[in-house]
C-alpha cells in the first residue's frame, strides 16, 4: 500500500509540507536569537511570535478548510495548496538572503494559513482513498511520517542557518522541498467531491462554531478529539521543554537537544508502526487506555530520573559534552523513558485518528478533522500558557512539568475507557 499510486504521492505531499513548516520556523527562530543583533528581550519576544504564528491560523481557518475539503475534489485542492506553498517560498528565499525579520514573520503566518487549509484535506483523504481495512495502517504511516518530518525539519533548520552561507542554503532547501511536494500533489489520483452541494459559510467564526457543535454532539467523536488533543499538547510541551531540560537539569551542551528530538520522533514513529502491526492481528481500541497509562508511568520515571541527576560541573557556567554524559547511567535511563513514552503516544494516537475518520459521516469527515484541529490548537496553546504561568510564578520547575503531564495522561486514559468496545476494520 505504501508505494501505491493512491498513497505514496500523498505521503510525499504532506511529508515535505510538514518538513518545510518546521525548517522555516526553527531557522527563523535561530536567526532571530543569534544573528539579528537585537537586545535579548526583543529577540525573545520575536522568537515567541515566530513560534505562535505557525499555529495561529488554525483557529480561524480550520472550519473553512474543512468545508472546502468536503465541497471540492480533493486532488484539485492538494494541487492548489501546494502551488500556494511554492509561490510563498520564493519570497521566503529572498527574505532569508536579506535577513529581513518582519517580512519572514509575515510569510510564516501565511505559511501557517496554508498548513491550516491543508490539514483537514490530509486526514479526509485517507478514508476516501483507502479501503476501510487500511485505515489503521494509513494513519500509522501518516502519524509516523508527520512527526519524523516535524523533527527532522526542526533539526535541519537549526543547523542550516548556522553554517556558512546558511541563509542562502536555508531558503534554497525550503524552495526545493516545496517543489518536491508540488510534484507529489500532481501525482495524486483524481477523486470526486464528497459534498458538492455544500454551501461555504463566509463567516469564519460561525463556521468554526458549527463544526465544533457537530463533533461534540457525538460522544465517540468527542472522545477521539479530546484524546488526540492530549497527545498534541503533551508532544508540544516536551518539544518546548527539551532545550531547557538539557541545559538546566542535565547541564549538557546544546548538541544533546537535537539528539533528544530525534529520540522522541523515533519513539512516536515506532509506536505508530507497532500499532498497525498489532492491529492486523487483534483489536487495538482496548489498548488505547493502557498505552496512556504506560505513557504516564514512563513520564513519572523521567521525573524521578531527572530529580536524581547528580552530575553537576565544578564551574557553574560549564556544560558537559555528549561524550562525558554517555558514561552516566542516568542519561540512558532518561533516553529510554523519552523513547518509550513517545512510542506510547504514537501507539494510542493512531487508532483515535482512524476511529475519528471511520465514525464521521463521509460527507462531513473533513469538517470533523477541522474541529479536531481547532481543539488540538487550543489544547497546545492552553498547555503552553498554563505551563509558562506556573513556571513564571515559581510553582513548578522544568522537572515538575513532567508530573503534570503524567497526571493528565492518566486522567485521559480513564476518560477514553468507553472507547475500548469500539472496533476498527481489520485486514
Feature roles, as predicted:
Residues 27-58:
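Extracellular/periplasmic helix-loop-helix junction of adjacent transmembrane segments
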Residues 8-25, 51-88, 103-162, 223, ...:
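Substrate-agnostic recognition of the 12-TM MFS/MFS-like secondary transporter fold
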Residues 101-108, 112, 137-195, 267, ...:
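Hydrophobic alpha-helical transmembrane segments
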Residues 40-48, 254-262, 370, 402:
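Small-residue hotspots at the loop-to-helix junctions and early N-terminal turns
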Residues 1-8, 191-227, 249, 315-327:
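Juxtamembrane intracellular "pre-TM" segments in multi-pass secondary transporters
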Residues 124, 128, 174-200, 306-310, ...:
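Helix-loop junctions on the cytosolic side of multi-pass membrane transporters
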Residues 83-99, 293-327:
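C-terminal ends and interior cores of transmembrane alpha-helices
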Residues 27-38, 93-98, 151-174, 248-249, ...:
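Transmembrane alpha-helix termini and helix-breaking/packing motifs in multi-pass membrane transporters
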Amino acid at each position: 500500500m505504501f508505494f501505491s499510486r493512491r498513497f505514496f504521492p500523498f505521503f510525499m505531499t504532506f511529508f515535505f509540507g510538514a518538513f518545510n513548516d518546521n525548517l522555516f520556523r526553527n531557522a527563523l527562530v535561530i536567526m532571530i536569537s543569534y544573528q539579528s543583533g537585537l537586545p535579548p528581550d526583543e529577540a525573545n519576544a520575536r522568537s515567541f511570535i515566530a513560534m505562535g504564528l505557525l499555529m495561529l491560523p488554525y483557529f480561524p481557518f480550520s472550519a473553512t478548510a474543512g468545508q472546502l475539503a468536503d465541497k471540492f475534489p480533493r486532488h484539485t485542492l492538494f494541487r492548489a495548496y501546494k502551488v500556494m506553498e511554492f509561490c510563498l517560498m520564493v519570497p521566503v528565499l529572498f527574505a532569508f538572503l536579506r535577513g529581513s525579520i518582519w517580512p519572514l514573520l509575515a510569510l510564516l503566518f501565511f505559511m501557517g494559513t496554508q498548513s491550516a487549509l491543508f490539514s483537514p484535506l490530509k486526514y479526509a483523504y485517507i478514508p476516501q482513498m483507502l479501503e476501510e481495512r487500511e485505515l489503521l495502517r494509513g494513519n500509522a504511516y501518516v502519524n509516523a511520517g508527520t512527526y519524523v518530518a516535524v523533527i527532522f525539519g526542526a533539526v535541519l533548520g537549526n543547523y542550516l542557518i548556522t553554517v556558512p552561507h546558511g541563509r542562502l542554503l536555508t531558503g534554497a532547501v525550503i524552495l526545493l522541498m516545496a517543489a518536491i511536494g508540488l510534484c507529489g500533489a500532481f501525482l495524486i489520483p483524481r477523486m470526486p467531491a464528497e459534498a458538492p452541494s455544500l454551501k461555504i459559510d463566509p463567516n469564519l467564526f460561525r463556521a468554526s462554531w458549527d463544526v465544533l457543535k457537530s463533533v461534540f454532539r457525538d460522544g465517540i467523536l468527542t472522545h477521539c478529539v479530546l484524546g488526540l488533543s492530549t497527545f498534541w499538547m503533551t508532544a508540544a510541551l516536551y518539544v518546548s521543554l527539551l532545550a531547557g531540560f538539557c541545559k538546566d537539569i542535565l547541564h549538557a551542551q546544546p548538541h544533546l537537544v537535537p539528539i533528544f528530538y530525534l529520540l522522541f520522533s523515533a519513539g512516536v514513529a515506532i509506536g505508530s508502526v507497532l500499532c498497525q502491526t498489532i492491529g492486523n492481528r487483534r483489536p487495538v481500541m482496548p489498548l488505547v487506555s493502557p498505552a496512556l497509562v504506560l505513557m504516564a508511568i514512563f513520564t513519572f520515571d523521567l521525573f524521578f530520573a531527572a530529580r536524581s541527576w547528580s552530575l553537576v560541573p565544578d564551574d557553574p557556567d560549564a556544560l558537559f559534552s555528549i561524550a562525558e554524559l554517555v558514561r552516566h547511567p542516568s542519561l540512558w535511563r532518561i533516553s529510554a523513558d523519552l523513547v518509550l513514552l513517545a512510542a506510547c503516544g504514537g501507539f494510542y494516537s493512531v487508532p483515535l485518528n482512524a476511529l475519528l475518520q471511520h465514525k464521521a459521516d463521509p460527507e462531513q469527515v473533513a469538517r470533523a478533522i477541522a474541529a479536531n484541529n481547532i481543539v488540538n490548537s487550543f489544547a497546545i496553546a492552553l498547555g503552553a500558557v498554563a505551563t509558562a504561568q506556573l513556571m513564571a510564578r515559581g510553582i513548578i520547575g522544568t522537572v515538575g512539568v513532567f508530573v503534570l503531564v503524567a497526571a493528565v495522561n492518566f486522567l485521559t486514559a480513564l476518560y477514553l475507557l468507553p472507547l475500548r468496545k469500539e472496533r476498527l476494520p481489520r485486514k
